[in-house]
């Protein structure tokens, strides 16, 4: 029977979304072949071996929660009692973090369907708007001003997905958005498998998002690198801002 690297096998079996993620699971001691822990990412394992991931290396419904939790801790922001919009909610990692930190209500918005974790669907504090583009939100979707907007969207630039949600923000409202260079950069700057490796491109797209937010009436507080990478090892950034008075 043919063999291949443990990290690649985890990806092929759908147990990790990228080799970078697979390597993190192996380092955390969460990946097994049979009952034996996988020791190294490069370990050769039979392609038909019984492999599994046991436990999690974070407490959230998805690893996306690691990103927002890091940002809020770094910023020292208390969001207890906040009404929030989660743009690109997906499984609900960001929503999970906000509820854990005391958010009063979260409007979970995603163009997909049946992605939000069941425990969040059952939470009275979560208002689910599936199959709903953030670009077409109305007062029927968001019937109150919001204190916080978070965003982890894919396949679209922030300047295209955020303007409508931002219109629901109170003066002084806060924003934490994930900058994904592969969706902000020029097409020729995006390499194989959608990866942007050029640090100069990273810096430029972060600057462009910052400038756009400030032109839109928001004061940028800080931009920090995400504590974990995206698919295929893409470096991502978290930008934080507050809404200025009109």
Residue ranges and their predicted role:
Residues 107-156, 160:
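S-adenosyl-L-methionine
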